[in-house]
Amino acid sequence: LKPSNYDVQFEIPTGYKVAKIQVGSNNDVDSDIQSDGFVRNITLISGEVSTNVDAGFTIISNAFIGDFVWEDTNGNGIQDTSEPGIEGISVQLTGTTILGTPVNISTISASNGSYGFDNLEAGTYSVKFSTTGTYRFTAPSSTTDDLDSDANPNTGATRSVTITATERVHYLDAGFYRLSSIGDFVWNDLNKNGLQDSSEPAIEGIRLSLINSLGSVVTVDDSDVNGKYSFDNLLPGNYTIKAEVPTNYVLTTQNNTDLNLNSDFSLINGNAATPTIAVSSNSTNNNIDLGLSAAKASISGLAWADNNGDGIVTNGEPFKQGKLVYLLNI
């Protein structure tokens, strides 16, 4: 080079930023590059060899991955506005930076269900959520990426995402639900008032079927000696219950004066059934009761002249009209 003033320009690599300039007093070991990649006004005199024009770079680590862990109370796989976050879920981030450095870090979801990994380098990562207690993963990919659950129910892991050094990922979420139960009591409504009176007995052996929103039978149960029945370990969702009413019983009167003691069944399309029951995550509804009362009976027959005295209606023996018949208690 001829003696003169020079500028040196460095190309800043992807994923890096310029290091702090001229730190310390030793010009041989510091960085001279400015934020735009230039070292300016280098003066060379005749015969000079300058070996201290240096450029230092540091990896940009300003990326973020995180979002939300929530309880999917209705089991639809969507973050509805009323559904709460879950605290204490273990979340693990694994992956590799663009330089090939492996990453494996963990955190715990906060009280509002949020979690996050900040100051990440550019790279490819995935997130794994670990279930605790009775939580189960909800169905993934049920709606847009901002509102769905991204965790594979079998592994707890999300898909891999590749991010730049400044990218902010706020859409890797995990939804959980817990199992629930519904049921209660079948009784003989002796006074037919539609309410469970303390002296009225239970009815054993009544078959009840749990029907899901698709119209399929999920499970069945028979009322026990105490009239109790229960459907347990249920997924959140909408259900109805159908009852097989014996011919010697009918549904009792509908009475809504006390919802804790009334009967919840009515005739729906010819079947004894409840209205739709919304079952939410981690709920117990022991208030679905069935009241039955004795069916009305009838007595009928023939009055005839048994001319031959054989006790059998024989052809030719006349019927008797206008005879008064009494029904007596015994």
Stretches with model-predicted labels:
Residues L1-V69, T73-N112, G116-N226, F231-N329:
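Acidic Ser/Thr-enriched surface turn/capping motif at secondary-structure junctions
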